[in-house]
């Protein structure tokens, strides 16, 4: 017998009431959720709501990613915090979840997203490409651990 092939599907949903997430949880077996936020205080309200909902519905939370954590100046490599000091770390610590990545607001990434080209394919050695590759590898490991935990 051949090993069963695992398929991964990523569903991106905007913050809101949580109705979409609840519907998906009721209809699909969700292996894990990744909470993605920005450093803005208003976004953290949705993060907390999402964390509580996934905990209540027993959907494993793989971690938190902070998007647009800082602006990465292409000429100097200097980091600028566009949204001020982030409180994402405080929320992650309070609810006992790990921040898996702090992704920058990077001009090359934005340009390639607009063109529909993955930066990881175009410039795999770019700092941001490496961050996405590491995040993807980390998520796959966490998903495998969740699957192992659920089979025992």
Residues of each region from the PLM?
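Single conserved hydrophobic/aromatic residue that forms the stacking wall/gate
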Residues: 1-11
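Conserved catalytic-core segment of NTP-binding enzymes
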Residues: 14-112
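Short boundary/hinge segments that flank catalytic cores
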Residues: 99-100, 121, 130
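C-terminal boundary of histidine-terminating zinc-finger modules
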Residues: 115-126
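Short, amphipathic alpha-helical "lid/cap" segments that border enzyme active or binding sites
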Residues: 125-137
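Short, hydrophobic alpha-helical segments
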Residues: 136-150
């Amino acid at each position: 017998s051949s090993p069963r092939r695992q398929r991964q599907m990523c569903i991106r949903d905007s913050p809101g009431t949580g109705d979409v997430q609840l519907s998906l949880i009721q209809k699909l077996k969700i292996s894990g959720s990744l909470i993605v936020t920005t450093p803005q205080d208003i976004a953290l309200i949705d993060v907390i709501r999402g964390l509580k909902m996934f905990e209540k519905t027993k959907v494993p939370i793989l971690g938190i990613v902070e998007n647009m954590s800082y602006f990465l100046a292409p000429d100097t490599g200097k980091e600028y915090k566009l949204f001020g000091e982030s409180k994402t770390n405080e929320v992650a610590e309070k609810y006992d979840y790990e921040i898996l990545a702090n992704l920058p607001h990077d001009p090359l990434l934005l340009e390639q997203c607009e063109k529909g080209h993955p930066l990881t394919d175009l410039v795999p050695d770019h700092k941001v490409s490496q961050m996405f590759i590491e995040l993807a590898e980390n998520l796959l490991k966490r998903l495998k651990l969740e699957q192992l935990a659920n089979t025992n």
